[in-house]
């Protein structure tokens, strides 16, 4: 009688029993395209300067695909403070993201895979399991754009 509201993923591995939680899949391409289209619209409208900034702050789907939801205090309840300044997630400003991930590729991999409880990441990170894996939600190009933006905060 309970029903999940998660969007089923595409390209799940055969061993994955449930397409809503499969490890090998991703959001439907139509949803990924919707995310990209909205980010491009926000840049064209002048709301944000780059696709990475737009994706970081994207409120599509109540912020389910954005970083600001956790990394900007007040963002989730309509009173955003310093962008990337920390909230539920850590502060990403002042070069802290670059210090944690000196190599861009390591930061991309972390965002794609998320945090695992007790597993080390970056230079000094200790996983809590709170950082979701965005690799199944955003494309590699979108994640790279977000990383470029965050590394400049």
Range-by-range predicted roles:
Residues 52-54, 70-71, 108, 112-115:
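Short, well-ordered amphipathic alpha-helices
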Residues 11-39, 74-88, 119-120:
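Surface-exposed intrinsically disordered loops and tails
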